[in-house]
Regions:
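Helix-to-loop junctions at the C-terminal end of transmembrane segments
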Residues: 63-74
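Single conserved hydrophobic/aromatic residue that forms the stacking wall/gate
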Residues: 1-7, 12, 172-179
Length: 179
């Protein structure tokens, strides 16, 4: 869909948008409904809180590694790998109930978060140049904020309709692949 924005021509491709927006909607939904996830999985009250250490550690490590990888291979080449850890995290949430799976789940989300933070800036600069990077970042940040609201609302609607975490995670597993 071509879009004119502050004198620049910017093409938002569905696959790029869905790739970039999957991380914020799934991660935010997970963070907001962590007590529901913990209860659904039968985890103790501190399991997810402790698992955020894995999220933080893997996110920071991935931030450093992804910068090096982008310089070596380019953002476009790495973009296709950004949501693989997120996909794996959703599979872990769907299939596994042990407390240890919470650490794996949030660690994998941390990896996707680290990739998304770096790729979220460098991808647009690679594709469209830096002349209108402020306008492009403003638009993509607005879309990201919408994505976080969408994810939280979708989680809430599915939970309010009586679904357990497994069907909710399955929904979040399949939606980003529909583009």
């Amino acid at each position: 869909i071509p879009l004119r924005l502050v004198g620049s021509e910017m093409c938002i491709r569905d696959s790029i948008c869905m790739t970039m927006l999957a991380m914020p909607w799934i991660a935010t939904g997970t963070f907001v409904y962590q007590s529901f996830i913990s209860t659904s999985k039968g985890w103790g009250p501190y399991v997810i809180a402790q698992s955020f250490m894995a999220y933080s550690i893997f996110s920071v490590i991935t931030l450093f590694i992804s910068g090096f990888l982008i310089d070596k291979f380019s953002s476009r080449r790495l973009l296709i790998y950004m949501n693989i850890p997120l996909l794996m995290a959703t599979v872990v949430l769907f299939y596994f109930d042990s407390s240890f799976s919470s650490f794996i789940f949030l660690g994998l989300i941390g990896i996707s978060n680290g990739l998304a933070n770096v790729l979220g800036s460098s991808t647009w600069a690679e594709i469209y140049g830096v002349k209108y990077i402020g306008s492009i970042k403003a638009l993509t940040t607005a879309l990201m904020v919408f994505s976080t609201a969408f994810g939280t609302a979708l989680f809430g609607i599915l939970i309010d309709n009586g679904l357990s975490i497994e069907p909710v995670s399955y929904t979040h597993l399949t939606l980003p692949t529909k583009a």
